[in-house]
Amino acid sequence: MPQRLQILYNTVIVPKLQKELGYTNIHQVPRLEKIVINRGLGEASQNAKALESSIAEISAITGQRPVITRAKKAIASFKIRKGMPVGLMVTLRRERMYAFLDRLINVALPRIRDFRGVSPKAFDGRGNYTLGIREQLIFPEINYDSVDQLRGMDISIVTTAKTDEEGRALLKAFGMPFAS
């Protein structure tokens, strides 16, 4: 079943951006490709409970089980051996991607303390946007009492936009609250 933002994109955003950016074909209009959520876990190598609680939190937030990322090589100063778990990653596409973006923009970001908007400078030069979140409590799926430690995450929104301006126009049309 199509999500609210997916219907908004197809009915309102595509014609608006097509006119605004001067495209002749609707397939030239930038669209969301995927959303990648990444969490680095430095303490996971010593604490297996931290890894399990992080898996449960990210599964609750995204509705999808994360992949455990492992160390590619040993680093003695960090007490990490090759193959040890060092983080978690989830790639969201299609309906889950639109559902997550909807919750992020309309529910989670407004719950951040002293929130004045996200940085308009966090684009990578190719129209993709990356956002860092310091604590997982901004998501309503996380129960405050079950959190043992505040952990952040990186959210990368990958678009088919060719420039940062196109990517910014797309995310602004979705309702992303950029700081002025």
Curated annotation (Swiss-Prot):
GO terms for cellular component: ribonucleoprotein complex; ribosome. GO terms for biological process: translation. It comes from the Bacteria. The keyword Heme does not apply. The keyword rRNA-binding applies. GO terms for molecular function: rRNA binding; structural constituent of ribosome; tRNA binding. Pfam families: Ribosomal_L5, Ribosomal_L5_C. Transmembrane segments: none annotated. Keywords: Ribonucleoprotein, Ribosomal protein, RNA-binding, rRNA-binding, tRNA-binding. This is one of the proteins that bind and probably mediate the attachment of the 5S RNA into the large ribosomal subunit, where it forms part of the central protuberance. In the 70S ribosome it contacts protein S13 of the 30S subunit (bridge B1b), connecting the 2 subunits; this bridge is implicated in subunit movement. Contacts the P site tRNA; the 5S rRNA and some of its associated proteins might help stabilize positioning of ribosome-bound tRNAs. Part of the 50S ribosomal subunit; part of the 5S rRNA/L5/L18/L25 subcomplex. Contacts the 5S rRNA and the P site tRNA. Forms a bridge to the 30S subunit in the 70S ribosome. Belongs to the universal ribosomal protein uL5 family. This is Large ribosomal subunit protein uL5. It comes from Synechococcus sp. (strain JA-2-3B'a(2-13)). The gene is rplE.
